[in-house]
Amino acid sequence: MLQISHLYADYGGKPALEDINLTLESGELLVVLGPSGCGKTTLLNLIAGFVPYQHGSIQLAGKRIEGPGAERGVVFQNEGLLPWRNVQDNVAFGLQLAGIEKMQRLEIAHQMLKKVGLEGAEKRYIWQLSDGQRQRVGIARALAANPQLLLLDEPFGAQDAFTRDQMQTLLLKLWQETGKQVLLITHDIEEAVFMATELVLLSSGPGRVLERLRLNFARRFVAGESSRSIKSDPQFIAMREYVLSRVFEQREAFS
């Protein structure tokens, strides 16, 4: 379980987050949404252990987070892949740093690539892949170390609509299959409503928790309903419009 208590953080000398209290249970998919500058990415960086926080506590499985750790896998918006390594070696890179024997790490990389639909692409290089394929490699790399918590920072923001839908449904299938805790940062309202089991709305900066919404559209998808059917459901449309109105309220307040 991820537990965040009374978290305060600065960014560039200015308050970025103020009194954040969140809990992410095992098997849940929490999405954080808010206007630009609300501290979404700062929150993810704090959970990942990339930057320090000023006050409060972040704990995973009862242990305080005070730096990066293998129990947290991160997928970045720009993938962060190594162009001089092939696909398999990119996925296995973290395992290599952890001292895992070569044959074992290559087998793990192969299994992760199979999970994300890239079996057979092991020897290709990053520049030979589409944007969507690169993001699949990033997800496979994050999963390779078998983390307790998967963190994703607007991973599909640069994708076209068709690829974005593919990646959203892939992530939901992986979430169901692995049972991992997932925290997704996004600026896409439809994506947030579709994917979240719990949606957290942040206020304009400094970010505060404005509202928490329990949603079931992701569970409907993994139970077998199509994404198209869900996104055309009047209940989905009504929730999307409600969330849109809340985000616009914050944008107007910020301006």
Curated annotation (Swiss-Prot):
Enzyme Commission number(s) from the entry: 7.6.2.7
SMART domains for the chain: AAA
ABC transporter domain ranges (all copies): 2-229
Hydrolase as UniProt keyword: no
GO molecular function: ABC-type taurine transporter transporter activity; ATP binding; ATP hydrolysis activity
SUPFAM superfamilies from the UniProt entry: P-loop containing nucleoside triphosphate hydrolases
Membrane topology: Peripheral membrane protein
Stored PROSITE patterns: ABC_TRANSPORTER_2, TAUB
Keyword Membrane attributed: yes
UniProt: ATP binding residues: G34, P35, S36, G37, C38, G39, K40, T41
InterPro entries: AAA+_ATPase (IPR003593), ABC_transporter-like_ATP-bd (IPR003439), ABC_transporter_ATP-bind (IPR050166), P-loop_NTPase (IPR027417)
Gene Ontology CC: one annotated term: plasma membrane
Reactions mediated catalytically: taurine(out) + ATP + H2O = taurine(in) + ADP + phosphate + H(+)
Keywords: ATP-binding, Cell inner membrane, Cell membrane, Membrane, Nucleotide-binding, Translocase, Transport
Compartment annotation: Cell inner membrane
Family: Belongs to the ABC transporter superfamily. Taurine importer (TC 3.A.1.17.1) family.
Entry-linked NCBIfam families: PRK11248.1 (NF008421)
PANTHER family: TAURINE IMPORT ATP-BINDING PROTEIN TAUB, TAURINE IMPORT ATP-BINDING PROTEIN-RELATED
Function: Part of the ABC transporter complex TauABC involved in taurine import. Responsible for energy coupling to the transport system.
Assembly and oligomerization: The complex is composed of two ATP-binding proteins (TauB), two transmembrane proteins (TauC) and a solute-binding protein (TauA).
Protein name in UniProt: Taurine import ATP-binding protein TauB
